[in-house]
Amino acid sequence: MQPFIKPTIAFLFFVLISCQPKPDKKVFDQVNLKIQSIIKPKFDYSILEDGDIVLKRGTGQVSILMIKYLDEKIPLSHCGIIVKEDTSYSVIHSIAKEYTGIDGVQKTTLSYFLSDAKLKDSYIVRHRSPISKRKILKTKALGFLNNKIPFDYDFDIRDTSKFYCSEFIDHALKSTYKKEYFSRKKIGHGEALLLNSLLDTTYFERILN
């Protein structure tokens, strides 16, 4: 276990989510549908492809906490992998059960994923590889979803049995391309994955922003 990460990020994360009311699944679904019905696309979603990666700067307390600890040039707090389903787009990502009623890797609509972020604070990037390879990235993400990988409340990047958001992307990318893309930041005796790594245009093309 990483001794500094756990009493800082992980502990504060628990304090924040413990203050949140437990979600009612029925109410959550109703709110989700309502938000989807009123959100209008502000850019051409049709240009998106399987395996694109979406990043955002959330506005919640945990997002603010993550932004503070990562202290990156472009403040970001959450990410996921886009999958195309007929004419709609979904995002596979990992998040704590306290926010959605589902623990760990899960799927939601792209519009709902972005509903708590401003478009100017959101990014969509695409790995500079053939679509056939990016479809493998999508397949890896779906595999983690089907295996119901739990959320990593310890924020321990050495533990591959559970993922927090960027850890999920990290494993999907590494298992697809056999390459490390995330830079890491030392925090005490531990390390954190830096989301700005995915904005490196050497490896990723920016589709949004």
Which role fits each region the language model picked out?
Residues 58-123, 151-159, 163:
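Glycine-rich catalytic cores of cysteine/serine-nucleophile enzymes that process amide/ester linkages
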Residues 20-85:
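N-terminal accessory segments that precede or flank the first globular/catalytic domain
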Residues 20-24, 153-209:
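Activation targets extended, charge/polar-rich intrinsically disordered C-terminal tails
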